[in-house]
């Protein structure tokens, strides 16, 4: 999966964000298994970038929830 920018994430609905998080977590788990079994990662920075993307999505979801509560 490509890196998602904050502006791209903001355009998604909450349900789409949840789907992206699930997809990214599966990808992260697959990379983690590959790493733990001693395999060489296809892209060494992919694990950390995937974690950052998940955090970015969760942050924007919280922003949307807070915005909905205040409105």
Curated annotation (Swiss-Prot):
<dbReference type="GO" id="GO:0005840">
    <property type="term" value="C:ribosome"/>
</dbReference>
<dbReference type="GO" id="GO:0006412">
    <property type="term" value="P:translation"/>
</dbReference>
<protein>
    <recommendedName>
        <fullName>Large ribosomal subunit protein uL29</fullName>
    </recommendedName>
</protein>
<dbReference type="InterPro" id="IPR001854">
    <property type="entry name" value="Ribosomal_uL29"/>
</dbReference>
<dbReference type="InterPro" id="IPR036049">
    <property type="entry name" value="Ribosomal_uL29_sf"/>
</dbReference>
<dbReference type="Pfam" id="PF00831">
    <property type="entry name" value="Ribosomal_L29"/>
</dbReference>
<dbReference type="InterPro" id="IPR018254">
    <property type="entry name" value="Ribosomal_uL29_CS"/>
</dbReference>
<comment type="similarity">
    <text>Belongs to the universal ribosomal protein uL29 family.</text>
</comment>
<keyword id="KW-0689">Ribosomal protein</keyword>
<dbReference type="GO" id="GO:0003735">
    <property type="term" value="F:structural constituent of ribosome"/>
</dbReference>
<keyword id="KW-0687">Ribonucleoprotein</keyword>
<dbReference type="GO" id="GO:1990904">
    <property type="term" value="C:ribonucleoprotein complex"/>
</dbReference>
<feature type="region of interest" description="Disordered">
    <location>
        <begin position="32"/>
        <end position="51"/>
    </location>
</feature>
